[in-house]
C-alpha cells in the first residue's frame, strides 16, 4: 500500500524549477484528447499543477475549462502569470477545493508519487464525474544513455526514502480505491541544454536542494566530471538529454 506523504517535504527553488524542468512532448496532447475523449464540453483538473510545465499540453486539447490546483501558492503565481485564463486554486490532493462530481478528468504530471495515498484517491474519486478519468504523467530520463545513467545514480544516492516515480509504490493503489487497472503509453523526446542548465536541473530536485551546502558542492563537482565526457551537440556548447514521457490512465468505477 502506498504510504501517507507530507506534501511539505517537497521543497525546491521555484525559479530553478521553472527554468530547469523540461516541458512535455507535443504528442502528449493527442494522448489527452484521444485517451480521455476531450472536447469543448470537458472540464479538466490539473492536480499538483506547479508552475504550469504541463499546462500548455492540456490547453492544446481545447477543453471547456482547466482548473489548476497546487499546495504551493508561489508556484501557482508563476502558472497564473503564464496562463491567465486558467482557474488557479490553492489546495492539496487530500483537500481538493472542488464540488463533488464536478470534473471529467484529473491530470497529475510529475507529482502523483507525492500524494499516492488512500486519502488523495478518495478525494480524486469524489471530484470526478461518473465514468471520469485519471491521468498520471512523468518525464523520466533515458538511463540507457551512459552519462544519463551516471546522473541518475547520483540522484538515486541522495533520494533515499523521498517519494519518487521510480519506486513504483504509487502503482500499488491500482486497481482499487474506486479505479480500474492502469493503461500505459510512452513518448520519447529530448532537449538540449548547457552544462550550467544541467546544474540548475540538479538543484530543482527537492532532496538535492535541501542538502547542506558542502554536500551540494560535492554533487556539482561530480556532475562537472561527468559533463567532461558528454558529447556536445554539433557546433554548440549544449548537450542532449533524452527522456521518456510515461503516461498512465485509469477510469473511475461505479460505487459499490
From Swiss-Prot:
<dbReference type="GO" id="GO:0005829">
    <property type="term" value="C:cytosol"/>
</dbReference>
<keyword id="KW-0808">Transferase</keyword>
<dbReference type="GO" id="GO:0046547">
    <property type="term" value="F:trans-aconitate 3-methyltransferase activity"/>
</dbReference>
<dbReference type="GO" id="GO:0032259">
    <property type="term" value="P:methylation"/>
</dbReference>
<comment type="function">
    <text>Probable methyltransferase.</text>
</comment>
<keyword id="KW-0539">Nucleus</keyword>
<keyword id="KW-0489">Methyltransferase</keyword>
<dbReference type="InterPro" id="IPR013216">
    <property type="entry name" value="Methyltransf_11"/>
</dbReference>
<dbReference type="InterPro" id="IPR051052">
    <property type="entry name" value="Diverse_substrate_MTase"/>
</dbReference>
<comment type="similarity">
    <text>Belongs to the methyltransferase superfamily.</text>
</comment>
<protein>
    <recommendedName>
        <fullName>Uncharacterized methyltransferase-like C25B8.10</fullName>
        <ecNumber>2.1.1.-</ecNumber>
    </recommendedName>
</protein>
<dbReference type="GO" id="GO:0005634">
    <property type="term" value="C:nucleus"/>
</dbReference>
<dbReference type="Pfam" id="PF08241">
    <property type="entry name" value="Methyltransf_11"/>
</dbReference>
<keyword id="KW-0963">Cytoplasm</keyword>
<dbReference type="InterPro" id="IPR029063">
    <property type="entry name" value="SAM-dependent_MTases_sf"/>
</dbReference>
<dbReference type="GO" id="GO:0008168">
    <property type="term" value="F:methyltransferase activity"/>
</dbReference>
<dbReference type="GO" id="GO:1990748">
    <property type="term" value="P:cellular detoxification"/>
</dbReference>
Amino acid at each position: 500500500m502506498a504510504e501517507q506523504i507530507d506534501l511539505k517535504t517537497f521543497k525546491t527553488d521555484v525559479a530553478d524549477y521553472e527554468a530547469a524542468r523540461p516541458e512535455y512532448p507535443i504528442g502528449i496532447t493527442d494522448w489527452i484528447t484521444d485517451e480521455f475523449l476531450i472536447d469543448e464540453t470537458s472540464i479538466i483538473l490539473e492536480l499538483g499543477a506547479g508552475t504550469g510545465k504541463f499546462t500548455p499540453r492540456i490547453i492544446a486539447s481545447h477543453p471547456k475549462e482547466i482548473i489548476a490546483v497546487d499546495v504551493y501558492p508561489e508556484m501557482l503565481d508563476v502558472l497564473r502569470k503564464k496562463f491567465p485564463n486558467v482557474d488557479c486554486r490553492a489546495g492539496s490532493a487530500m483537500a481538493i477545493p472542488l464540488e463533488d462530481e464536478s470534473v471529467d478528468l484529473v491530470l497529475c504530471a510529475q507529482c502523483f508519487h507525492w500524494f499516492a495515498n488512500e486519502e488523495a484517491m478518495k478525494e480524486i474519486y469524489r471530484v470526478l464525474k461518473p465514468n471520469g478519468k485519471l491521468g498520471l504523467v512523468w518525464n523520466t530520463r533515458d538511463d540507457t544513455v551512459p552519462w544519463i545513467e551516471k546522473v541518475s545514480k547520483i540522484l538515486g544516492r541522495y533520494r533515499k526514502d523521498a517519494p519518487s516515480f521510480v519506486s513504483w509504490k504509487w502503482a500499488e493503489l491500482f486497481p482499487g480505491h474506486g479505479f480500474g487497472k492502469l493503461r500505459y503509453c510512452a513518448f520519447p523526446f529530448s532537449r538540449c541544454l548547457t552544462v550550467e542548465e544541467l546544474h540548475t536541473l540538479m538543484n530543482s530536485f527537492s532532496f538535492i536542494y535541501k542538502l547542506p551546502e558542502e554536500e551540494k558542492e560535492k554533487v556539482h563537482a561530480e556532475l562537472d566530471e561527468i559533463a567532461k565526457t558528454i558529447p556536445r551537440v554539433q557546433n554548440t556548447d549544449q548537450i542532449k538529454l533524452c527522456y521518456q514521457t510515461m503516461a498512465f490512465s485509469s477510469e473511475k468505477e461505479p460505487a459499490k
